[in-house]
Amino acid sequence: MAAECARADVRDERRVWHTHRQPRMRQEPHRLVFFDETYVNTKMTRLRGRSRKGQRLRMKAPFGHWKTHTFLAGLRCHELSAPWIIDGPITRLAFEAYIETQLAPTLHKGDVVILDNLAVHKSDRAAECLKRRGAWFLFLPAYSPDMNPIEQAFSKIKAHLRKAEARTFDGLWRAVGDICNLFEPQECWNYLKAAGYASD
């Protein structure tokens, strides 16, 4: 948890979220879409391994030039939706393009897109796009990525990408596509449940 969570204003925001927003969200988890982005690159490799007792583990890891990309997706109670990769870091224009072309077509009237409180996410154009679909943005309290269950899904994606060791952009695309198909409805439900957004 970020050290800033101890600040009075952030602590109060988090308390209000837990006591007022989450109980309401648990009543209709099918309307929730948790959005976030994370980096993926062509140098990802396993960070840990096993070896015989008393022997040092030696592995090869890429060094030098690599390509970093941004992976964006939404997590619903039954699926990982609208996965997308962009070349480079997230920008306001890329975020708006993602919302308009990838995420918005998957939304239904009454859906709530929950996301981090980042400057690039505060786009009037993206908000208007959601409004036309009958959906809206709801920003998490500041410094609170732990309240977004998609972080757990990203952890799984990165673990599989390290195992895949994709060294080209095309290989990275294929690996991410294969990994996105691994998310079962029960697993997605469990992510929401663990974060307090769904009940038994």
Where are these regions (language model features)?
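Short functional hotspots at interaction and active-site rims
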Residues: 1-200
